[in-house]
């Protein structure tokens, strides 16, 4: 009998969802940084064996939206509750369980099995962990609570074991040689955006969208033209930097990661353009692939 299902990873920003996703799938599918709101889309990573297919989904962190981009991010997270065969709700040792949290309340009413994963236990002590387990038991009594460390991979194998046990009998949803639902261009944009998140401060990384305008693949080389969109002329100047040095650093570091990702020589050209207030424009958000409804 073949097993298959959707295993969706949800939780607040910066609790380690993307790191967990990469550890479970065994591939670097989601970008992971120390900054909140790194993930903007719902990203699938597909784990295949002869008799099993697990479709993991990494989702944006749950937050109260302040503009339309964040509304779209919340939509991705909420939709992950509806189609989950197994839900992985990720919290960490810093987060305090909140009985007034609407999203947690929705998780509590789910029919699908919920594994509540308390992440980053390598940064805590036993006493604090016991307190958190008891508090979460009270809040989500039906959930199975598992302490983990996605960074050190502590208990990640056990999480995978439980997922396999809970997965329903089903034929595969995707071809067995497919490892994600996203095209190559998507990973180019994410790797460039990751560098911007790492190298720029304050609001700059959150005001950026990356679009691949050309992706031309040859036998040993890929030619890529990418546009970095910002909301203000002042932001454009900051992204480019003095004598173009800041943008050059982003492009150089992104190119190295892209060469590792694709296993080919990368010729990368980057440009910076202003798209005023794109984060609040329905039209622009849809053109960038965000879900608004």
Segments the model singles out, each with a brief description of its role:
Residues 1-81:
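Conserved G1/Walker A P-loop phosphate-binding module
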Residues 16, 155, 246:
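Conserved glycine(s) of the Walker
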Residues 30-32, 99, 171-175, 198-209:
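Active-site phosphate-binding and catalytic loops of NTP-dependent enzymes
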Residues 39, 62-64, 96-97, 124-125, ...:
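Catalytic P-loop NTPase motifs of RecA-like helicase/translocase cores
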Residues 51, 75-143, 216-218:
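Conserved C-terminal guanine-recognition region of P-loop GTPase G domains, centered on the G4
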Residues 58, 119, 149:
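Active-site glycine-centered loops adjacent to acidic/histidine catalytic or metal-binding residues
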Residues 113, 122-180:
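Canonical P-loop GTPase G-domain recognition
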Residues 184-293:
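P-loop NTP-binding site
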């Amino acid at each position: 009998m073949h097993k298959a299902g959707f295993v969706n990873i949800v939780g607040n920003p910066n609790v380690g969802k993307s790191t967990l996703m990469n550890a479970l799938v065994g591939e670097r599918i989601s970008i992971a940084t120390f900054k909140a709101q790194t993930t903007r889309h719902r990203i699938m990573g597909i784990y295949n064996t002869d008799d099993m297919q697990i479709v993991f989904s990494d989702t944006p962190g749950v937050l109260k939206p302040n503009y339309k981009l964040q509304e779209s991010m919340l939509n991705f997270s909420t939709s992950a509750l509806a189609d989950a065969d197994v839900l992985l709700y990720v919290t960490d040792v810093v987060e305090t369980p909140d009985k007034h949290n609407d999203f947690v309340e929705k998780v509590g009413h789910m029919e699908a099995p919920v594994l509540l994963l308390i992440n980053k236990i390598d940064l805590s002590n036993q006493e604090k962990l016991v307190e958190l387990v008891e508090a979460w038991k009270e809040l989500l009594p039906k959930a199975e609570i598992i302490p983990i460390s996605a960074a050190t991979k502590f208990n990640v194998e056990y999480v995978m074991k439980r997922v396999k046990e809970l997965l329903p009998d089903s034929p595969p949803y995707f071809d067995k040689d497919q490892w994600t639902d996203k095209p190559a261009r998507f990973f180019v944009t994410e790797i460039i955006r990751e560098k911007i998140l790492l190298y720029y401060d304050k609001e700059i990384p959150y005001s950026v969208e990356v679009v691949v305008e050309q992706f031309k693949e040859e036998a040993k080389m890929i030619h890529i033209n990418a546009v970095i969109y910002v909301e203000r002329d002042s932001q454009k100047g900051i992204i480019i930097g003095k004598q173009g040095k800041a943008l050059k650093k982003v492009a150089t570091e992104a190119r190295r990661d892209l060469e590792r990702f694709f296993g080919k020589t990368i010729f990368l050209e980057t440009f910076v353009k202003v798209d005023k207030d794109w984060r609040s424009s329905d039209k622009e958000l849809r053109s960038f692939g965000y879900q608004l409804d």
